[in-house]
């Protein structure tokens, strides 16, 4: 396994517009330098370009299959949301999906092509002066844009999330950081918990 703390503004996989300077390129180079051979990076989870935090990379097919089929990987994020969220601890359960070429995920019934989505929200701090809420969000499903869409649907888009109408005055990227992963070690089966601090730009917004 390789665990990476991805900085914001880095793309995970090469695209037609961005073929180099991606996380995948960097991991291939890292494997070549440390192991002396070329390995294809097998990403268990992915993050949007402007999202920071922990990513799991499997070094072989067995580890990838173990993570996908044999263990539950708990993923928890730290988030700064626009506005003051009054409830301390709650779930958001709304099916989400996209329509046509619109990149946004909206509330969409499963009958109309949406997918079930469940997020647990725990408020950590309310900043009434800046009108923002600092919170933890744990994913119980892994839909694209799930946290961003769910918070938007309850009227509290992420600070810096232009796509979902978040407050752009105090941040230029969505304030979303994958800070904790919990899963079983594929070799020893011991329970692992990996945590990383929030990046500097999020700390600045919270000041």
Where are these regions (language model features)?
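The conserved catalytic core of RNA pseudouridine synthases
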Residues: 37-68, 94, 98-154, 178-207
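RNA substrate-recognition surfaces in RNA-acting enzymes
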Residues: 159-187
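Conserved short-loop catalytic and cofactor-binding motifs
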Residues: 11-12, 135, 169
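RNA pseudouridine synthases
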Residues: 1-100, 201-205
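Short, solvent-exposed coil/turn elements at secondary-structure transition points
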Residues: 83-85, 127, 164, 197
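Intrinsically disordered, low-complexity segments enriched in polar/charged residues with Gly/Pro
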Residues: 32-33, 82-83, 108-111, 122-125, ...
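Flexible glycine-rich active-site/ligand-binding loops centered on an Asp-His dyad
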Residues: 20, 77-82, 153-168
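Short edge beta-strand segments in beta-sheet-rich domains
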Residues: 22, 72-76, 91, 116, ...
